[in-house]
Swiss-Prot record:
Region (NBD1): 12-195
Species of the source: Mycoplasmoides gallisepticum (strain R(low / passage 15 / clone 2))
Region (C-terminal): 618-717
Gene expressing this chain: clpB
Record remark: domains: The N-terminal domain probably functions as a substrate-discriminating domain, recruiting aggregated proteins to the ClpB hexamer and/or stabilizing bound proteins. The NBD2 domain is responsible for oligomerization, whereas the NBD1 domain stabilizes the hexamer probably in an ATP-dependent manner. The movement of the coiled-coil domain is essential for ClpB ability to rescue proteins from an aggregated state, probably by pulling apart large aggregated proteins, which are bound between the coiled-coils motifs of adjacent ClpB subunits in the functional hexamer.
Annotated binding of ATP 1, by residue: G59, E60, P61, G62, V63, G64, K65, T66
Record protein name field: Chaperone protein ClpB
Keyword Kinase: no
GO biological process, one term: cellular response to heat
Chief place where the protein resides: cytoplasm
Subunit architecture: Homohexamer. The oligomerization is ATP-dependent.
Classification via Pfam families: AAA, AAA_2, AAA_lid_9, ClpB_D2-small
Binding site for ATP 2: G465, P466, T467, G468, V469, G470, K471, T472
Ribonucleoprotein recorded as keyword: no
CDD domains: AAA (cd00009), RecA-like_ClpB_Hsp104-like (cd19499)
Amino acid sequence: MFASFTPTEEKNVLSKYSRNLNDEIARNAIDPTIGREEEIRRLIEILSRKNKNNPVLIGEPGVGKTAIVEGFARKIVNGDVPDNLKDVEVVELSLSSLIAGTQFQGSFEERLNKILKEVKNSSGKVILFIDEIHQLVGMGKNSSNSAMDAANILKPMMARGEIKVIGATTIDEYRKYIEKDGALERRMQKILVDEPTKQEALTIMRGLRERWEAFHKVRIFDDALVAAVEMSARYISDRYLPDKAIDLIDEAAAKIKTLIHSLPPELDNIKQKIIHLSTELAALEREKKENHSNVRLGRIEQLKKEIKDFTNKQNELTVKWTQQKTIYECINKLKEEVTNLTAEIERLQAKGEYTQASKLLYLEIPKRQEEIEKKTKELSEFTDNLIKTSISRVEIAEVISQATKIPLSKLVASEQQKLLNLKNDLSKYIKGQDHAIKNVSDAVLRGRAQINDPNRPIGSFLFLGPTGVGKTEVAKKLAYCLFDNEKAMVRIDMSEFMERHSVDKLIGSPPGYIGYDQPGVLSDAIRTKPYAVVLFDEIEKAHPDVLNILLQILDDGQLTDNHNRLVNFKNTIIIMTSNIGAEHILANNPAKTIEELKRKIRPELLNRIDELITFKALNDKDLSAIAQKLLSDLSDRIKKQQINITFDKKIVENVVKHGSNTVFGARPLKRYIQREVENFLAKKIIENKLEKNKSYVCTFNAETNEYTLVNLRKAVS
């Protein structure tokens, strides 16, 4: 005889696949929601409706959609809701847990139906919150070979009002998934969540500051919060407030917390010095034991003295560091007690135990706050502050500089000097174009001082001039002076964009075309390096329609790529070069140059450029300076082979005389030096006629038309 077997129904299935927001708020495990009162009120209104009482929060990632639901749950816990929503529990459904292990047909539907049945049986006392609600569309259909997806199981119960659901998703995903399912869209009521303003974001962060301070055990100054909002809004364009500003504070606090628990830099430096000196001492003492004749006994004694001094300094700083750390840990313990007491006061007041709450509020908390002030004063009395315990604007600037590679941190003396000397440094490389150098270096200074227009590039320039006068070289050397690397420049050769459709190379192919999944050359380069010199070389060679893409870059400092992502050009220097009107520049006729420029470049583009700079033709003095620079570079290259060669004035005069060409600028000089001087020196090096570690002077004999190398002892011809 076979008995029929009925499996026991699983109880509390809802708690297995979800988390109760009310419980977590009661345990003070969720940060409070600051502001967003209008959205929370709208949420309550929709949930109080008879029909279409399933709100869905729609907004960009990071604007605070989940925080609004948590704020609503907090109002329920505090009893600040209408009677129909009192004692209601907000339960967040975990979709990943729900679908895990449902590989057999029907298992997913069974599990979801059990959850929905439990919600239904609660008689409206449970509200389901589903984050990323667009995932319901299609969920369960593929993984468990089901005939229905999660959305189709939910829809009938939502239509009958048997369950209430709060959803949250982004604008793109709502459009892509939910709008396509008309029945699901009709059952939900949209609440648009906009990005908060800077002031609203700052209010949110000020409200959360105590929680961050308690968690990271560091002090966060108000100027750090202001800087986080302002700098994130200006320099991080692909994310949204308040999330991006909160991330900056969190990152800076984590950085300081890590430093607190690590050896201070002062102690670490001394430790490294002791290691280096001890290593050198050990090597010298070993040589002394082996009776080497060249052992420096004086150096051994000096090393012993230095090691002793550094060890004493290390011991002194270690004692101070230990004392400061002990006081700091005591302060943190007291602050933690204050936080716990504050939470206990709220709990007691909610229960109506006001006597006990008053005792904690007016007796216990002031006692601990007095102790905190005493310990803080004790910590501030140390002359050597080895523990950094606070975050200011400087730390926020360091974090954002590290993340975006945009130099915002406080100027150190070396960098300050480099910026002030930028004009002189550029003049060393570029000869005869002082006007161009001044304008470009001034633009960099404005940008670094952060007084330029924040909604446009740091500077935009159009360099006009004949070939070979230094237009491209200015951009290269500017990148070198700013980043110590010419490759930091983003160079776009506009001769590659002669067809109308070649604009796709810059921002990527549009949807449906081959290469849509590949990024554009320009957009990808700036997303990777937002602080860069961007050179559009020879713009007259590109198709006129391709240049239209520059309009929004120059005007708004941003560009939308093929994936509809904003690319931020507000921290770039835009340089365009052109040979338009070169013959008029050589003829010293600026009016005709501008006339030809207006014929070939559209006025709306010219009107957006900050400065139109005309590079003049090079005269003999300029060419002589360039020849000296080229020969100096050649001398530096030869020095790598331990051969010192200098070039006299006769060589320079000969190079300028035979190698210059007004039409072609400085490039013929380079070719002449390569053809005549470099070939001569190469033969001498291959023939081993030049000795290493010797100095030579290279000269030119005009009568014999020969080059000669002269040293102190003999001539090599």
